[in-house]
Amino acid sequence: GNLGRRFCTILDEKRDHLRQRYGLDLTLIGAADSRGAAYDPKNGLNLEEVVALKSSGASIADYPDMGREAWLATDLVATAQADVLLEASPVNLDQGAEPGLSSIRTALRRGMHVVTPNKGPLVVAYSELHELAASHGVQLRFDGTVAGGLPALYIGQRTLRGAVISQLEAVPNLCTGYVIDMLADGLTWDQARERAREEGVLEGDGSWDLEGWDAAAKLVILANAVLDVPARME
C-alpha cells in the first residue's frame, strides 16, 4: 500500500544517513501485497524497482525473477531469514485483524523484531503479542498506531516511566473533528464528508473514522500501553 511504498522510498533516500548516524545497513529482502510476494535473501530487493512496480499498479509478485504469485504475506514471514518485520497491512477488524495478526505472531515466534502501524492486531491481541515478544527476546514497536506524527506512546511508556498516569484525555480521531467543524460552518453531512475525502482527510467510505472505530482502537491501545489496563476489542 501507500505506507509500504513510502517506507521503501525513505529507506532508499536515507540509506547513507542511517549507516553513518546509526550504523544501520538495512536491506529489504522480501515484500508482500495482497496479490503475491517477492523474496531475494541473497541480494535483497531493489527499492526503486519495488516503488516503481507499486506506483504502476502492479503487484510485488511481478518483481523480475524473484516474484512469487502463490505466496501470501504469511508465507513470506514464515520463510524469510530476516531481523525485522515491518507489518503494514489493512486493519481488517471484521476479519479478526488478519493477515496482520498471523504475520506478527509468526515473526515474533521466529525471533524477528516487529514494527507496525497496524492497529488491528494490537486491539484484539495486545497481551498475547507482548508476551510473545518478551518470551522470544524481541521488540514489538507500534508508536505509529496512535498519533503517528506525535510521540504520544513514547512519552507515556518511556519518558513518563517513573510517573503514575491515572487519566488520559485525547482527541483520538482528527478526521471526525474536521467533519464536525464543517458541519458547524453550515455544510451538510454529505458535503462535509465529500470535502474531507477530497482533501485526503477521509479514506474510503469513512465508516472506520466516522463510526468511531478508529477512536476506539486508539483508546484500547493507549489503555494497554500507557495505563496497563488489559482492554481489547471484539
Predicted regions and their residues:
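N-terminal glycine-/serine-/threonine-rich beta1-alpha1-beta2 phosphate-ribose binding loop
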Residues: 1-109
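Conserved active-site and cofactor/substrate-binding residues in soluble primary-metabolism enzymes
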Residues: 2, 6, 26, 45, ...
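General beta-strand structural signal in soluble alpha/beta enzymes
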Residues: 31, 84-87, 115-117, 140-144, ...
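Conserved phosphate/anionic-ligand binding catalytic regions in large, soluble enzymes, centered on
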Residues: 36, 170-178, 211-215
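Rossmann-fold NAD(P)-binding glycine/threonine-rich loop
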Residues: 90-110, 116-157
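Oxidoreductase and adenylate-handling cofactor-binding alpha/beta cores
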Residues: 152-165, 176-187, 217-231
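Substrate-binding/catalytic subdomain of NAD(P)-dependent oxidoreductase enzymes
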Residues: 182-183, 191-234
